[in-house]
Amino acid sequence: MFEVEYLIKDCDDVNKNTLEQEFQDLNIEDWKWDAATGQLIVKGSVSPSKVLRRLENATSKPILIRGASNKESGVSILYEANEDITQIPKVYGLCRFIPTEEKIFLDLIATQLLPNREYTGLVTISGDISRGLKSAGDSLVTLFNANSNEQGKIVLDKEVSGSLPNWIGHCFVLKCVDDSDSATMGIISRSAGLGQNTKQICACTGKSLWTEHAELKSVNEGSSCCSKKDSSPSEKPSCCSQEKKSCCSSKKPSCCSQEKKGCCSTEKTSCCSQEKKSCCTSEKPSCCSNGKSTVCA
């Protein structure tokens, strides 16, 4: 069990009954809501990311995780494991490290990975990410193995053994078991506990927390590696194959937006369910435009 502090933006019209229903569905009984400030404190064993997604969907409001646990927590923003320090690193996700009574609760979301592959999560002996895996060093402790889905995404919540204070300042690495070139990594930094985070502007970027939240959310909900602008056809995995009838194209972005529920499957599932218009023809995927189906690949 652990406590997590959330902040809901523009909370004036948030219905408390809506929150209560979501917490009932998640089997969470201990929570406190301050309608004046938008502060929400939740105690339970459900991953913070899962709670956040449920509440954002239910309230249609942006929500921040402001702090977790009364003990020292940690967080690692996952970047591309790139040896070229002159490039601006891409963000691949985030992993939270939340101490419980006896273990450490991991709350991980990683995107843009190779689809349907096994990945290992580990802490390395170094905290140097300047040259990617080369500077991170060998493994200090292996935390878990997990498989990416067809979209190249891993969502994981898991308790592991270890001492978080001994990991602070080290690298957290998520790397593919059978492809050493596919890896993402970040430094494990201290994060705020309950009531400790009052900042509105990030000192590192100068952006508001809500701006950074929107950017990170777009990464977490992003599509798989088949939508990367700089991906070559040879780099595009099975999610972009003709057999999968994917909407992803090496030349054009996916016709299936986040609102249109992903790529067309072999069962010809509609990508435009909200409009009740199928994006899929019998031969090739298509996209919906102005109420008409137009081929996009």
UniProtKB/Swiss-Prot annotation:
Gene Ontology terms describing biological process: cellular response to metal ion; intracellular copper ion homeostasis; removal of superoxide radicals
Cellular component aspect of the GO annotation: cytosol; mitochondrial inner membrane; nucleus
Cited InterPro entries: SOD-like_Cu/Zn_dom_sf
Transit peptide found in the keyword field: no
Binding-site residues for Cu cation, renumbered to this chain: C11
Statement: the UniProt record of this protein carries the keyword Cytoplasm: yes
Span list, region Disordered: 222-263
Highest taxon listed in the record's lineage: Eukaryota
GO molecular function: copper chaperone activity; metal ion binding; superoxide dismutase copper chaperone activity
Location, primary (coarse class): cytoplasm
Compositionally biased spans, kind Low complexity: 234-257
Subcellular location: Cytoplasm
Keywords per UniProt: Chaperone, Copper, Cytoplasm, Metal-binding
Similarity comment text for this entry: Belongs to the CCS1 family.
Free-text function comment from the UniProt entry: Copper chaperone for superoxide dismutase 1 (sod1). Binds copper ions and delivers them specifically to sod1. Also has a role in cell protection against copper ion toxicity during conditions of copper excess. The C-terminal region is thought to act specifically in this sequestration role.
Protein name: Superoxide dismutase 1 copper chaperone
Organism, scientific name: Schizosaccharomyces pombe (strain 972 / ATCC 24843)
